Amino acid sequence: NPNFLETFAGIASSFKIPDKILEFELTESIFFDNQQIKTVRETIQEMHRMGFLCSLDDFGSGFSSLGLLKEFDVDTLKLDRSFFLNMSGQKAKDVISCLIDLSRHLKVKTVAEGIESMEQVELLGSMGCDMIQGYVFSAPIPVNEFEKRYLRDQP
């Protein structure tokens, strides 16, 4: 839908949602041909102009290219869970640490996806990872369960 940004901008305006609160996630698999790259670059620019954030989701899950990071002005790099399946070796830790450092140099926030243990949380924290998500905190839950658990004291 070519008007999807206008639709979301209208919703954000009607609910008085401040800029830089809503974030769109793009998966790296959409960046496979040159015409798409041009369209995606322009769409990301339009997202930012309208006050939205943009993240590159599942980075490293397929045929990711570091070139994507120079092509697109994303706000967040979401590192795919495959990076964290076996973090016991030094080489694995070095790759993760380098990606986090690269993101920091590019002024892009990092999210580690699919984290399952407090040991991973502590290691990623020591590496400077900005955000962590995964089963270590909660399995996916239905909306009504979320509301019961987290919004019970709301008016």
For the regions a protein language model found, what residue spans apply to each?
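Catalytic-core regions built around general acid/base machinery
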Residues: 7-14, 39-50, 98
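EAL-family c-di-GMP phosphodiesterase catalytic domain
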Residues: 2, 14, 21-35, 52-155
